[in-house]
């Protein structure tokens, strides 16, 4: 199978959108949406559910960006006021490779768990809203973070992927593409943008806006400005951060990344930016080998990158200490206008790709504490973005418990976590790492 380095490719000239419209049987006047491009996946379930449709022609709540452009959200004010959770799903069913850990089964597994644990609108009414038919991100949105040469190169690569079935787009790395990858990645980025729009609109209606969760794939936090990396194609959270700044005037954005791997792409995008605070906890020495504790940003951005690499075996104790002593104080000092979260669930003890030992309860704690910090500092404006998590059981139970934290309900971690799978955490090394981060950042 031929390997392809995408950023070196020439411009395609927009062939992918007509091709996909033809493939889906839509005329060029139809908006491209998640459902119109879904190749296979879960069936639509109404059953009395609240389902919010985000189409420009639909009448509903609207917001104005910093350029005065109005955007219809199709979310009546009463729904925004009542909602505790807004979420979008973009499972990217066509973006798949057999035996690859980043599989198209990930998002459906989460959705199934939410349904079984009665955390969907079918069971919760307007407390939990799934926004469907959201629009893909525009190429200009993606270009807020990624180079034009990469974007157009990837678009061109779709014709090769159509011929070959699957291509590799990261040189010798693990990131692949199929013929639907480009458009599905635009949809995943669009999910995050839609949730930012909706959470911001809700925050203008009352003091307790819903939290957002973009249940999307492929993940994004490894994608660098010039290309793909580590299963990631576009930096979903980075695009949303720039969008929040440019379209909503939310100047100060805090990004918390608790994936087991360092979010090097997000870090690179904002390493010199004083208005975006990037904070990553990750396993020391894990892929991609970046995120050293002394890397704190540079130029005007010095001090707005905080890396906290944790020793292998770190778990609930480590993250509780990290949150109390590093994450919360850093947020309180930075005073963000919105908090975005790279929610990777591959730090779970059952995950096959790394060596931390978080539990379902750890992720519940993180979600609950981040919710509290967002309420205290930025009017509750907070959106989570799915990153890693490759054991479908631990991934789905942990995301479900995240939803319970958003709702302010007790954790069900005891149903999923087996204490026998855990071993003693390296407390001395954990303390050394936390103390060093506190010293470097004067916390």
Curated annotation (Swiss-Prot):
Q: Give Gene Ontology CC terms.
A: chloroplast; cytoplasm; histone deacetylase complex; mitochondrion
Pfam families according to UniProt:
Hist_deacetyl
| Top-level lineage group | Eukaryota
Catalyses which reaction(s): N-acetylserotonin + H2O = serotonin + acetate; N-acetyltyramine + H2O = tyramine + acetate; N-acetyltryptamine + H2O = tryptamine + acetate; melatonin + H2O = 5-methoxytryptamine + acetate
For the site labelled Polarizes the scissile carbonyl of the substrate, the residues are: 390
Q: How's its activity regulated?
A: The activity of this enzyme is not inhibited by butyrate, a well-known histone deacetylase inhibitor.
Q: Mention one GO biological process in which this protein takes part, according to its record.
A: epigenetic regulation of gene expression
Q: Where does Zn(2+) bind?
A: 259, 261, 346
Entry similarity comment: Belongs to the histone deacetylase family.
What protein am I looking at? Histone deacetylase 10, chloroplastic
Organism from which the protein derives:
Oryza sativa subsp. japonica (Rice)
Which gene is annotated as encoding this protein in its UniProt record? HDAC10
């Amino acid at each position: 199978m031929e390997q392809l380095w995408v950023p070196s490719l020439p411009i395609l000239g927009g062939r992918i959108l007509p091709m996909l419209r033809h493939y889906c049987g839509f005329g060029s006047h139809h908006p491209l949406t998640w459902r119109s491009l879904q190749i296979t996946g879960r069936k639509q379930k109404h059953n009395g559910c609240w389902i919010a449709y985000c189409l420009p022609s639909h009448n509903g709540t609207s917001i104005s960006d910093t350029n005065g452009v109005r955007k219809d959200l199709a979310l009546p004010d009463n729904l925004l006021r009542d909602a505790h959770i807004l979420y979008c799903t973009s499972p990217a069913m066509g973006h798949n490779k057999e035996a690859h850990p980043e599989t198209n089964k990930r998002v459906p597994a989460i959705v199934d768990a939410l349904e079984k644990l009665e955390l969907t609108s079918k069971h919760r009414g307007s407390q939990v809203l799934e926004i469907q038919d959201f629009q893909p991100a525009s190429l200009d949105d993606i270009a807020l973070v990624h180079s034009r040469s990469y974007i157009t190169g990837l678009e061109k690569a779709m014709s090769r992927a159509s011929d070959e079935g699957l291509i590799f787009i990261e040189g010798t790395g693990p990131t692949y593409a199929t013929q639907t990858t480009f458009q599905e990645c635009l949809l995943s980025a669009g999910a995050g943008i839609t949730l930012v729009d909706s959470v911001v609109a809700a925050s203008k209606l009352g003091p307790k806006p819903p939290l957002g969760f973009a249940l999307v794939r492929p993940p994004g936090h490894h994608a660098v400005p010039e290309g793909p990396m580590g299963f990631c194609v576009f930096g979903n959270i980075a695009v949303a951060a720039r969008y929040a700044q440019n379209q909503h005037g939310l100047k100060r954005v805090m990004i918390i990344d608790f994936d087991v791997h360092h979010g090097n792409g997000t870090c690179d995008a904002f390493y010199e930016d004083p208005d975006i605070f990037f904070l990553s906890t990750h396993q020391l020495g894990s892929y991609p080998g970046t995120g050293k504790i002394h890397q704190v940003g540079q130029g005007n951005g010095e001090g707005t990158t905080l890396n906290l690499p944790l020793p292998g075996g770190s778990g609930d104790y480590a993250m509780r200490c990290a949150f109390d002593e590093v994450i919360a104080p850093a947020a309180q000092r930075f005073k963000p206008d919105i908090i975005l979260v790279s929610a990777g669930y591959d730090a779970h003890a059952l995950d096959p790709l790394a060596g931390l030992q978080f539990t379902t309860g750890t992720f519940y704690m993180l979600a609950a504490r981040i919710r509290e910090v967002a309420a205290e500092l930025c009017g509750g404006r907070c959106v989570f973005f799915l990153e890693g998590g490759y054991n479908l059981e631990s991934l789905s139970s942990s995301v479900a418990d995240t939803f319970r934290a958003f709702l302010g309900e007790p954790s069900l971690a005891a149903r999923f976590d087996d204490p026998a799978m855990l071993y003693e955490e390296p407390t001395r090394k954990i303390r050394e790492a936390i103390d060093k981060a506190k010293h470097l950042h004067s916390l």
